[in-house]
Amino acid sequence: MLFPLCLSRRGKKRGEVEGRSRGECGEMLSERVRKSLIKGSAIRRAFEEGQRLAALYGADKVYDLSIGNPAAPAPEEIRRAMREIAEEDALSLHSYMEDAGFREVREAISENLNERLRKGEFLLERRDDYAAREEGGKSREEQEKQGRTREKEERRLPFTAENVIMSHGAAGAMNIFFRTVLDPDDEVMVLKPYYPGYTSFIGNCYAKKVEVDCQGEDFQIDFSDLERKITVRTKLLILNSPNNPSGTVYTAETLRTLAEILRKKEREIGHSIYLLSDEPYRELCYTRERLPFIPSFYENTVIAYSFSKSLSIPGERIGYLLIPAEAEESGELLLGARNSTGALGFVNANAFFQKVAAASLQAKAPLAYYRENLDLLYQALLESGFSCRKPEGAFYLFLRVPDGEEERFLERAKAHRLILVGGSAFGMPGFVRISFCGKKETIEGALPVFRRLALEYGIRKEASGTYR
């Protein structure tokens, strides 16, 4: 904290906190913000603690693995585009545009996505397949006779500029969509483990977060818990794959089951349930399997996308909201989302980086950089005796704390100047999140600390020459 706040109101009226005048001790803050300050952001708090320790001991003596701040340099396409676009006509470059963003940028994004779909970069669900399951099961021959649906769909270019709304990252896209569809007391399903920011985004609309349990070492969805918790107030579900913090990539079979449950519940409660696919890590997948394209599995899907992680430009805050035509009331959603962009004060996404992003759509994420860090960290943790699953995507590793006491583990780590984030922030007490997107030297410097911690917890005996 940069300044002390006296935020307790118990037993006091407004303006009567221990003799202080009205306006002190957070009395002028809204109740929602006051509670947010008390709880704070675990990720930001850890990051700021790392900055404080770095100022005391030197950055090379602090091992900050808390935040997803990529150390891989932005691709050359980004730097080249910045130089070229900076020379464009200043008036057109820096002026307002329509709320949804520059049309030529949205056209470039939609055309790029269409091209990737056409090339088969994503795994598509066969619409005739799931229609057959709902109708009681048709043979593959019957499906092929009905027009070879898959071939037609893959040739079709499903997206246009009208489906795209430029935003300040995926977080901005989510806030735009939430304001568009949520009323107070509506319910939003979040799948454990989940990004902590969802709590604030949902709270901005006075809606309610409903946590859904996961199961197994691979953090798969507990479908019985999901089905039990969907009510008439359920408006949408957030899916994050590859997942932050676990690195899990949900399989096609998982998505089919999820889609079937959502359709079943839609019929029961009498209205649509939107699935918001949060995709800042779409390009960061370490398996050879194609990443499922979620709108092809469930028609009421919208996508919040960010260029931050894949192109190493998190501070530029650029992304988009994609609303496919198949989504229920898609026309109204698009109109509402444009309105929400202005009403939230965004007005429009960053003009300069809209154009930079459009010019860099062919740039590739530095997967080799992250994979090298991951392999180094994962192998060392296993050899030290820790229990963790190798992530399939994103750039985080979710480590189980040996005795389940995450706060004590975090404090012990901090005593060695190792900064991590507790699993409670992600809805999963007893874990810690480790970011491996930083510099390799930081990862290497952290490994002896993990070995010391393993010794302290008695999960690994010291071997001569192994630890320092």
Label each PLM-derived region with a short phrase:
Residues 163, 180-201:
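Conserved PLP-anchoring active-site segment centered on the Schiff-base-forming lysine
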Residues 29-134, 140-169, 176, 360-363, ...:
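N-terminal small-domain helix-loop-helix segment of the aminotransferase-like
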Residues 72-73, 371-375, 384-416, 432, ...:
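Conserved PLP-binding catalytic core of the aspartate aminotransferase-like
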Residues 345-350, 364-367, 375-401, 422-428, ...:
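Conserved small-domain helix->loop->beta segment predominantly found in fold-type I
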Residues 111-115, 227, 361, 408-421, ...:
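PLP-dependent enzyme catalytic core of the Aspartate aminotransferase-like
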Residues 299-371, 375-378, 454:
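Conserved core segment of the aminotransferase class I/II
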Residues 199, 203, 210, 220-233, ...:
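Active-site pre-lysine segment of PLP-dependent enzymes
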